[in-house]
């Protein structure tokens, strides 16, 4: 199964790769380096020059060559490797006529539990979205930032007491909207210091969040582990990690109970299954990160079908309508992916990833690059949001 062509495909706000064999079979993947997709596309083209003319089947070999050649990596590089790896698994499944999860040992489950995204600049908006999603059958919601996603151009400042009390009250309001049969996945987006993270986590304990995601920037596993050791609720982190050893360092320090590998950034399905096995050894649960398109979701579901420690799958739904419907962004770009039902989604069982890009979609959907932007602080610096 020789590779004839490797194409980076920027479509809308996403970056795909399409690998075509000499027989005309195609596989697709997606890069998760979403802030720097232009650089990731260049890396895809460079790796493509290596892959063309080679057999697509020895995926682990190609994965090692791409990771170990030229010594240097980083998100743009691992995003490219991840996209290519996913596409190679897609190709292999299609060649053999089986879904990717069959190649990973077979399905442990036929559907995956989802948590839907909730967005809103006010707590009233967030609470309304939680209620709508509960009525639509979802059993968990996430992307819940009790610090709120305010106008990114407005300079930020909050006194400590106000910041903590408002956030705790917001979580209480979200729990009221969710009831007791819906889990809350609290997402902080790295906006706290170590003492703030401890204060907030202790304050929201009575509302039983499923996890407390990314309270701190992830670069310092010792700081994350210190927080984990001083709070009564579990931490989830890892979406910015680009490889296995970052997760190993975090777990060795007991810095998280839920791991958030981005399959489109951490090395694709090959990297993801290594991280899942590592997590299993530490009794850590896997919550695949997915703020991307249905291609990313399909890759997450294929891996999630075949691992024992899948906790829940992130589902980046758009804000729900009045009927509670939760539409997946960019759903129109692919075919073959079911809609959620009762808070779960069926894992595709067609060959490969079980989905396809709509033919010619790259010519109909203009590229939408992401500008460099951060929220200013009143002191002249910047803050994460």
Residue ranges of each PLM-predicted region?
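Metal- or metallocofactor-binding catalytic centers and their adjacent structured scaffolds
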Residues: 20-96, 384-385
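Structured beta-strand/loop patches that form or line metal/cofactor-binding pockets in enzymes
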Residues: 1-28, 32, 331, 372, ...
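Conserved, mostly hydrophobic/aromatic
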Residues: 3, 24, 47, 84, ...
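Glycine-rich, aromatic-flanked loop segments that form ligand/cofactor-binding clefts
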Residues: 85-121, 125, 136
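Glycine-rich phosphate/pyrophosphate-binding beta-alpha loops
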Residues: 10-14, 30-37, 81, 117-121, ...
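Shared catalytic-loop signature of beta/alpha-barrel
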Residues: 42-49, 58-61, 202, 208-211, ...
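Extended hydrophobic packing segments that form well-structured cores
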Residues: 352-385
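Metal-dependent enolase-superfamily TIM-barrel catalytic cores that perform enediolate-based chemistry
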Residues: 111-225, 230
């Amino acid at each position: 199964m020789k590779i004839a062509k490797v194409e980076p495909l920027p479509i809308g706000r996403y970056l795909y790769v399409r690998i075509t064999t000499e027989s005309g079979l195609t596989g697709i993947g997606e890069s998760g380096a979403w802030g720097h997709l232009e650089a990731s596309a260049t890396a895809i083209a460079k790796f493509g020059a290596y892959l063309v003319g080679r057999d697509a089947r020895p995926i682990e070999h190609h994965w090692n060559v791409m990771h170990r050649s030229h010594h240097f990596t980083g998100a743009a590089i691992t995003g490219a490797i991840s996209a290519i790896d996913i596409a190679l698994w897609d190709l292999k499944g299609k060649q053999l006529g089986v879904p990717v999860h069959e190649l990973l040992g077979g399905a442990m489950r036929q559907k995956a539990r989802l948590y839907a995204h909730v967005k809103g600049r006010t707590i009233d908006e967030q609470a309304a979205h939680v209620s709508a999603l509960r009525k639509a059958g979802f059993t968990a919601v996430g992307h819940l930032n009790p610090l709120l996603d305010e106008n990114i151009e407005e300079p930020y400042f909050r006194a400590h007491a106000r910041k903590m009390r408002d956030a705790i009250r917001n979580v209480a309001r979200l729990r009221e909207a969710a009831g007791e049969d819906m889990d809350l996945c609290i997402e902080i987006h790295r906006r706290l210091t170590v003492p703030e993270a401890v204060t907030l986590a202790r304050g929201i304990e009575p509302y039983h969040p499923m996890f407390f995601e990314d309270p701190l920037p992830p670069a310092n596993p010792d700081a994350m582990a210190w927080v984990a050791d001083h709070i009564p609720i579990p931490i989830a982190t890892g979406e910015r990690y680009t490889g296995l050893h970052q997760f190993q360092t975090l777990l060795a320090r007991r810095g998280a109970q839920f791991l958030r590998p981005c399959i489109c950034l951490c090395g694709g399905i090959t990297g993801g299954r290594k991280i899942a096995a590592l997590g299993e050894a530490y009794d850590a649960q896997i919550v695949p990160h997915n703020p991307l398109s249905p291609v990313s979701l399909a890759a997450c579901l294929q891996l999630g079908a075949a691992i024992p420690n899948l906790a829940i799958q992130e589902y980046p739904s758009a804000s729900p309508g009045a009927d509670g419907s939760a539409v997946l962004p960019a759903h129109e770009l692919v075919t073959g992916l079911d809609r959620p039902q009762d808070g779960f989604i069926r894992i595709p069982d067609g060959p490969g990833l079980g989905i396809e890009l709509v033919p010619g979609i790259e010519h109909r959907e203009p590229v939408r690059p992401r500008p460099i932007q951060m929220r200013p602080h009143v002191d002249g610096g910047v803050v994460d949001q």
